[in-house]
Amino acid sequence: MSDSCPVAHEGNTQSTSESENPVIPSPTPAANRPRNNRDWWPNQPELSVLHAHTSKSNPMGEDFDYAEEFAKLDVEALKRDVIDLMTTSQDWWPADYGHYGGLFIRMSWHAAGTYRIADGRGGGGQGAQRFAPLNSWPDNANLDKARRLLWPVKQKYGKQISWADLLVFAGNCALESMGFKTFGFGFGREDIWEPEEMYWGPEDTWLGDERYSGDRELSGPLGAVQMGLIYVNPEGPNGQPDPLAAARDIRETFSRMAMNDVETAALIAGGHTFGKTHGAGDADLVGPEPEGAPIEQQGLGWKSAYGTGVGKDAITSGLEVVWTPTPTKWDNSFLEVLYGYEWELTKSPAGAWQWTAKDGAGAGTIPDPFDSSAGRAPTMLTTDLSLRIDPAYEKITRRWLDHPEEFAEEFAKAWYKLLHRDMGPVTRYLGPWVPEAQLWQDPVPAVDHQLIGDSEIAALKGKILDSGLSIPQLVSTAWASAATHRSTDMRGGANGARIRLAPQKDWEINSPAELSTILQTLEQIQQDFNSSQSGGVKVSLADVIVLAGAAAVEKAAKNAGHDVTVPFTPGRTDATQEQTDVESFAVLEPKADGFRNYLRAGEKLPAEALLVDRAYMLNLTAPEMTVLVGGLRALNANFGQTKHGVFTDRPEALTNDFFVNLLDMGTEWKGASSAENVYEGTDRVTGAAKWTATAVDLVFGSNSQLRALAEVYAADDAQQKFVQDFVSAWNKVMNLDRFDLD
């Protein structure tokens, strides 16, 4: 085989299509509909995200325990049923090569592949592919058929298996049914029952790419190149068939879902070892997506009028590619075909750019999916050729060509990571096939000692309060440790005490120099305690940090005249630097934390919007967000000890003064001339300076919904309720990552 460029560049490459599916029109928004509050006042904070997915939309009821129901499931029987389904072809959607494996792999990949590392959103952890917009994205065309094929299995096992688990488990079963040894599988994903409202991009049409600026700089936190795609356009950037340019898109988008070059190459080559794409004919004959389809189609979309519309006449992506001579068997044939031919640019019957083995080489070596007597020429996607043209991918895949066992191992690990990246630590996984924790799962050590009891807790609190550390220092450190948690992908939190490790110890928001001093004091308390104990009782630094915050809150409540006990459950452990992927953890660094009145320089989004997003990450309701902001201001816990929003003359006492003084009509607010994003409050009569604030503070008086909540806590009889609600919300945040307590 020649070592020269394997692709022929002759001919016109003007794209006639924008995307993987060039013919699916965008839905048309209703032009004349009643306006809602968001239409009239789009700049107000969107608080509804804090109250989504409540029991009101969940038919299972508040007492439903998925783990308990799953424990009753015969997982081996489930696997047999799913594998049997693979080769039971249905006339209404016939299986290519008599096997649905390729279809189910694509379904699982696309369910999990929406995950993005920047904010942890997306992924397969909630079964969101069942709902708009994902169920109707161009890249998910005809995956509605895959889900319908699975319905008899879901119907049989009912509440013992969630759709979220089944959608990704099916792909795992598909791989095993075709001879591949997977790395493992964890169940435990719970279904949502309404669409996830999240930012998928600025475009208002399918396949738009307004998300780019400059030299093809992709806007954060997005992980796909165009609206409605999972990753990249397989024809090449904006339909231009350039494998090297496509490699740039591939590297960027896959890295945004936490995949490196090896994992990326393994996923593409491994996934494309199976099945085919579908572009049999004129794609103008394909009907609307599921959400836009007529009611009589019962949620099935993309009905095609080309021929029979199914089987040999199916149109999905507009591409008509079969990668290997063995599309229902695991082997090394994808790489053998990729490197075994030179390639020339051609078009599918639907008009999409793809590549065919040059000069008729290999003609007849690729089987037809429905006619065993017919053969095809080898074909590839533009993005497949990227694995050969890009120097870094080429180095990886050429080695695999001669070392297929390494390829199989890397694909197994990458596939496992793809399906589980948004599930958090392995303590959340269910079932018998869970392998040992991987580095990307942010492992923490198991508890290997006796836990502290009430007497030890009381003694430690005393030592902490006598240490010379202030209430703001203790509160801020505990908050900084716990509030890294993201409910989107279950990462971060206080368990592991990673606040003392890189990169967290060096984040600006954590005031590294002061943090180091605080942690040294707390570590000394921990060491002194552990060395004085007998009977195997010990305490981790992670527990000491959280306990220190609890002690500080109790002292602040006492300063305000209230005796409270902040709940505390020991059992956290301390991770090591070796258990902490610095690059992976870097994405958890807050760009804003309104609870501490922190806003990183250069942020473009409004601070109050970022506060709501942070509250969403912490799984807080609007009332919980409100009481925490007010309480943390009273505790003087701002970043850098600024006085913005500290509306009290008795800081470090857990009072409702923030709300009382915010709602005081005797104060007039104006933007400060001396500082950006700061407001000055003056006496309405005398003009004397009273307070300073940020938008995060003032939004609780400006926004009507938040003001209504602030009024609850500003009332004369609200002090006790305020303290109780603050303690409850504080305890919730401290335990967000304690999945062992669920």
Curated annotation (Swiss-Prot):
Enzyme class, broadest EC rank: oxidoreductase
InterPro entries: Catalase_peroxidase, Haem_peroxidase, Haem_peroxidase_sf, Peroxidases_AS, Peroxidases_heam-ligand_BS
Cross-link (Tryptophyl-tyrosyl-methioninium (Tyr-Met) (with W-109)): Y231-M257
Domain of life: Bacteria
One GO BP: cellular response to hydrogen peroxide
Biased amino acid composition, Polar residues: 11-20
Keyword tags: Heme, Hydrogen peroxide, Iron, Metal-binding, Oxidoreductase, Peroxidase
Record note on quaternary structure: Homodimer or homotetramer.
Protein name per the record: Catalase-peroxidase
Organism: Rhodococcus jostii (strain RHA1)
Gene, per the UniProt record: katG
